Amino acid sequence: MLTELVAERIELGMDNIPSALNFIREGKIRAIGVTGARRSAVLPDVPTVAEQGMPGFEATAWFGVLAPAATPAAIIARLGAELDAIGKEAEFRSRIAGFGAEPPGLTPDGGSSPESFGVFLRAEIARWTDVVRRADIRVE
């Protein structure tokens, strides 16, 4: 989609910031709004969609680490602790922020845990299930 937008074969598109950031910085496309709850640290002058008249609008991309359901609790705890430690490292946070991604932050200390991710994941599933149901979206 971005190549079509840069080539002006389409007039509007939506993509995530890391994918579009270089095109924005080079002036090849213009960012109109961000879909998160707050402005992006790498695009602070670009207002949120909610700020532009659609209150409550929020749609973001996120990544998570998942394991098979039968994975022993001790392994999940160890993986969670290691991932949380990495997510709090200044170098990691700086590196992903540099290409427009936002670091994890599901717990009060700015980290994450298997439990906090589980809460987040269940909320996302419920939220998007409701959107699909209300919009009567069907698989074709």
Language model region names:
Residues 1-140:
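Conserved, function-defining micro-sites of small-solute handling proteins
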